[in-house]
């Protein structure tokens, strides 16, 4: 049993030593912060009708014109209306 504990600790330590940090310049970091999932401002809907109207409009049905507004309204429909 002691051998397996020692082996586990050794493997954990070697895996931690092999982790490499990748540098990120400030422009990339601020772009990542602005586009992060937690920072999105989602529109507020009082009912499902407005969200469904936004989600099912023609611009949201086309892959090339699908944007964050479409994603927010469609996510609202999936989470609250279906």
Curated annotation (Swiss-Prot):
Residues 1-21 form the signal peptide. GO terms for molecular function: toxin activity. One of its GO terms (cellular component) is extracellular region. The keyword Phosphoprotein does not apply. Disulfide bonds join 48-70, 55-74, 60-81. Its main location: secreted. It is found in: Secreted. Residues 22-39 form a propeptide. The keyword Disulfide bond applies. Keywords: Disulfide bond, Neurotoxin, Secreted, Signal, Toxin. Expressed by the venom duct. The cysteine framework is IX (C-C-C-C-C-C). This is Turripeptide IX-07. It comes from Gemmula speciosa (Splendid gem-turris).
């Amino acid at each position: 049993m002691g051998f397996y504990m020692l082996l586990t600790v050794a493997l954990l330590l070697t895996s931690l030593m092999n982790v490499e940090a990748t540098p990120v310049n400030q422009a990339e970091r601020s772009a990542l912060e602005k586009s992060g999932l937690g920072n999105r401002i989602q529109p507020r809907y009082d009912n499902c009708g407005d969200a469904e109207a936004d989600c099912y409009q023609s611009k949201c049905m086309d892959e090339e014109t699908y944007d964050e507004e479409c994603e927010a309204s469609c996510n609202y429909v999936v989470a609250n209306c279906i």
